[in-house]
């Protein structure tokens, strides 16, 4: 298993990162519920009362360990936590119990086994007791419970799996999607950091489109601490070779590259470079590795590496990463063909007016290559026409579909077969005038047979438009 190894990159910081959850938890620790009143009113059982008060009154870790050991045989600790969390009506007191529970696990990771053992004796999983709490209305309760679930899933030897794991990742993804309204985003990110350090959980996260959710969150407006936490989660994913192999097609490299080109925080730069090193070193297939490297080059990573190389760092890991990436990326651009560059750009989904798009020589020599891998490039261009909302991407994709049809005899048939003609025609009514213009040119190329006449006609139209603008 590809667990996260020792590295100078900081581990999950559960104590020092200031978050709303931690600030509220600190207040709760100073406001113990009146358990005596609950007991006298028969709202909690005597066993629960005895355990919770004994644990609260313990003054040291040693004393708390003694309380837990004395109640281990009958699983009282697990029973009491479950009973108080699910049966106490007052949210304020449930918040307190959850904070106590979280502190209990944070103080000693091995304590999670008490809860797994108790659940096993009842022939159930610990998750079945607590996943339902994630549907509560109180946001603190929900997020503190999420933090506890992550610890139960990571600190011990029992791993979450199946529908329980799917449900939990689905919850975390929804929390990430609500980044503008979620005041506990740092807690969500920390849960992901913990979970994705374990290889058993990575594939399920990727298979459930978790990477797309991460990329969207990274592309949004996030503060520095949250940005670092999310990139940490990506870094954990890249330790898995299968996931690293998919990185070029998942949008990970572009998202990290954009941040790298703008970030001045060494902490962020360090972990992005470490992620890039993982991607290039975990992939064996030459073509995939080269595509990943080209995407990094397109994100101006080489320029960042040059600036970093001029500085002196005390961190040997960072120096090694800079050296490795510089060598790999420099090698990738050596003898780079124009089609390699174009292919990488299309695969990234981030089209722009790079020189190849307007090069007659490029289209004459490479149009037939669009048919490789079952018309992969054609399919990607059509998908961009159907799904992108970026006017620049729509303009370039329309142009390229038209040029493919113009230079490949059977291009019209291929484009129509994959609904490309319909996709282009829908853009004739786009709001952006440039999109409408390039869509119109593409439609004309799809319909006209006399390319020489069309070329002269288009030149004439452009000249007329230019005169009109003047």
From Swiss-Prot:
Lineage: superkingdom: Eukaryota
Family annotation (InterPro entries): ARM-like, ARM-type_fold, ATPase_V1-cplx_hsu, ATPase_V1-cplx_hsu_C, ATPase_V1-cplx_hsu_C_sf
Gene Ontology molecular function terms on file: proton-transporting ATPase activity, rotational mechanism
Keyword Plastid part of the UniProt annotation: no
Gene3D superfamilies in the cross-refs: Leucine-rich Repeat Variant, V-type ATPase, subunit H, C-terminal domain
Keyword set, alphabetical order: Hydrogen ion transport, Ion transport, Transport
GO cellular component: a single term: vacuolar proton-transporting V-type ATPase, V1 domain
Primary role: Subunit of the V1 complex of vacuolar(H+)-ATPase (V-ATPase), a multisubunit enzyme composed of a peripheral complex (V1) that hydrolyzes ATP and a membrane integral complex (V0) that translocates protons. V-ATPase is responsible for acidifying and maintaining the pH of intracellular compartments and in some cell types, is targeted to the plasma membrane, where it is responsible for acidifying the extracellular environment. Subunit H is essential for V-ATPase activity, but not for the assembly of the complex.
Subunit structure: V-ATPase is a heteromultimeric enzyme made up of two complexes: the ATP-hydrolytic V1 complex and the proton translocation V0 complex. The V1 complex consists of three catalytic AB heterodimers that form a heterohexamer, three peripheral stalks each consisting of EG heterodimers, one central rotor including subunits D and F, and the regulatory subunits C and H. The proton translocation complex V0 consists of the proton transport subunit a, a ring of proteolipid subunits c9c'', rotary subunit d, subunits e and f, and the accessory subunits vah-19/Ac45 and vah-20/PRR.
Family membership noted in the UniProt record: Belongs to the V-ATPase H subunit family.
Name of protein: Probable V-type proton ATPase subunit H 2
Organism: Caenorhabditis elegans
Gene coding for it: vha-15
